[in-house]
Amino acid sequence: MGEQSFVVHVWGQVQGVGFRYFTRERALQLGLRGYAYNLADGSVEILICGPEQGVQMMLGWLEHGPRTAEVTRMEYEEAPPPQKGGFHTN
């Protein structure tokens, strides 16, 4: 299995509920790198990169997010891998 990299956008009740924090924790558990940033329109943009199995598990988790969030829509597409290591939030 190779590496995969996706940029993901999630909408719903995803800001002010710990979404980025829990996303970072889950990504690090899965050995992924990337970021989770709040956007001005109330959505969250996430870049995830790493082993295919971990990325696929993360995509499944992001469909629902943490218990504190309510994801109403999710879109993703392949993207270049991040320039930096680790997993960052704004």
UniProtKB/Swiss-Prot annotation:
- Look up the EC number in the record and give it: 3.6.1.7
> Which PROSITE patterns would you find in this protein's record?
ACYLPHOSPHATASE_1, ACYLPHOSPHATASE_3
Which keywords, in A-to-Z order, does the entry hold? Hydrolase
Alphabetical list of Pfam families matching this protein: Acylphosphatase (PF00708)
Q: Domain (Acylphosphatase-like): give its ranges.
A: 5-90
UniProt keyword annotation of Hydrolase present = yes
Q: Enumerate the InterPro entries for this protein.
A: Acylphosphatase (IPR020456), Acylphosphatase-like_dom (IPR001792), Acylphosphatase-like_dom_sf (IPR036046), Acylphosphatase_CS (IPR017968)
Mind telling me which NCBIfam families this protein's record contains?
A: PRK14426.1
What family does this belong to?
Answer: Belongs to the acylphosphatase family.
The name under which this protein is listed is Acylphosphatase
**Which lineage ranks, top first, belong to the organism behind this chain?**
Bacteria, Pseudomonadati, Pseudomonadota, Gammaproteobacteria, Aeromonadales
